[in-house]
């Protein structure tokens, strides 16, 4: 991962859209890597395509609604436009209808961080990067969800230098665990 693809809790991102773009980029990287490593790669990629279309559809609806409301359009006009957008941009098969067997049920993740420089590093400060990668792996059907019932433990560790100038190496070790050793219910 390049330096610009790392999200650190100490970063001072001035605008929420910059943060959102960075998180989306990292999430997409996680989803791509997850799809490539998944045994049912073709189905996962079809699901990821459907998810991308659904996100585009949702963003288009929000944008169009705001523009039309600003122009003073009636609710009927807005509803008609939303219907047209839905018909033109909806995926042929919704992502929720594309079933893939998850690889893990109850699991823990260890994130090993290998930075490009000897500069001081606190691996847990990369938790926003881990969260975005985990969300991408969730999209790639590695597990049903990354809530407390499924992802029961995360840890971080330093793994030495990456060996490549300007490039970070992040390794996620995912391990299935016995849920009886963790609190997985309310």
Q: Where do the model's predicted regions map?
A:
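Catalytic phosphate/metal-binding cores of nucleic-acid and nucleotide-processing enzymes, i.e., regions
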Residues: 1-186
């Amino acid at each position: 991962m390049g330096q610009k693809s790392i999200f650190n809790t100490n970063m001072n991102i001035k605008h929420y859209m910059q943060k959102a773009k960075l998180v989306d980029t990292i999430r997409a990287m996680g989803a791509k890597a997850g799809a490539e490593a998944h045994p049912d790669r073709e189905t996962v990629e079809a699901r990821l395509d459907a998810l991308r279309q659904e996100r585009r559809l949702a963003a288009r609806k929000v944008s169009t609604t705001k523009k039309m409301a600003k122009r003073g359009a009636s609710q009927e006009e807005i509803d008609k436009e939303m219907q047209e957008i839905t018909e033109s941009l909806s995926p042929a098969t919704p992502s929720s209808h594309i079933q893939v067997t998850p690889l893990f049920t109850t699991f823990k993740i260890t994130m090993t961080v290998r930075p490009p420089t000897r500069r001081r590093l606190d691996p847990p400060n990369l938790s926003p990067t881990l969260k975005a990668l985990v969300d991408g792996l969730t999209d790639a059907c590695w597990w049903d969800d990354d809530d407390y019932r499924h992802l029961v433990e995360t840890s971080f560790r330093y793994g030495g230098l990456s060996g490549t100038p300007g490039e970070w190496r992040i390794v996620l070790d995912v391990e299935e665990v016995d849920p009886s050793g963790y609190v997985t219910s309310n």
